[in-house]
Amino acid sequence: MLGSGQSRYRMVVAMASVMLAGVFWNGPASARIQGNCGDCHTMHNSQGGSPMTFDTDAAPNNNLLRGTCLGCHAQGGSSATVNLGTDNMPQVMHTGGVDLAGGNFAYITGLKGSGASDRKGHNIGPLTGTDAVLYAPPGGIVQFGHDDGLNVNTNNLSCAGTNGCHGYRYSSRGEGIGGSHHRNVDGQIANPTEPADSYRFLMGVKGYESGDWEETVSSSSHNEYFGLTAPVALGCSNATSCHTSDGAGVAPPDGTMSQFCATCHGNFHTVATDSSDGIGTDTMSPFIRHPTDLALPATGEYAQYTVYDPASPVARTGSVPAAPSGTVSPGSDAVMCLSCHVAHASNYSSMLRWDYSQMVAGGGQTATAGCFACHTTKD
């Protein structure tokens, strides 16, 4: 599995750092890419009789690009960011000691961490190889094409476009995210209308982007995520449909991170529908699946989680923060997908932020991480 995927990946990035030497990423205020157009684009994919693509492939790329997402953001180097003169470019595959907020695909291949495993993250074929066990996304909402892999599966999962996460999800990879780097915004994202002004190019997602992608992170310096105080019933044609009516394609109806994840893993997030049992029939415990987009209770064990922990982030409800806060407010701040998981990959099974096998109730560990960040009295 790792051989073909990694070899293609290494070939793509082998020349990327050389070719990108003149590209600049503007500062956090605008986050728009700057630099010589020819560092990213080629008019005819030909110069001096040779192809201009980063991997010297004779086949040209969409949007006149010299490479794909991997050539810029998955160089496999020793740092979570690559310096490009005036700023840094985030890396989703590297061997550095610090990972960015989205995690690190290197854990899947074994380039970093405790050993290769498909279970450690999303398997992007050209980068990590396809998943050897799963075909359809786990937790797909039970409706046509969503729970059986007909729409998105391990063979077609990509970074962007129809079968990916970033950009418009009705277009191929290139068109789905095309132009977004030139219009990218940073900081508070409260009214997303296109990928460029959506949180991390995730169409329709609201939030606050940390300018360094959490390369340096603390209780007072981090991303902020948007959520709801109570989850909703998701579907294809109701008021909380993931399919937009404004031509934007697939997007979370309320702009929350958990609803975005639910576009593939809907049965893990929705209140029960006619076809999916979801988290249960309502928003009150007991649940049959751990809820998301649900406010932490302001009483009992949950009331003790008051200092923001980047290892167990919460989502803010009501409005999108204009700046990061080091305070957690039980009763309004909500649990979400990323409270427990990372987006790309981690060193633990199921993309978890911690080793689930080490979460031992009543073990007297006085732990404050993992499950016990919220369930403060169960350690």
Question: Which residue stretches match the model-derived regions?
Answer:
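Bacterial N-terminal signal peptides that target proteins for export
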Residues: 2-15
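C-terminal segment of classical bacterial N-terminal signal peptides
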Residues: 20-28
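Generic secretory/membrane-interface signal
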Residues: 2-4, 20-21, 338
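Residue-level signal for the start and early helices of compact helical domains
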Residues: 15-16, 28, 283
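A motif-centric signal for short, conserved binding hotspots located
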Residues: 32-379
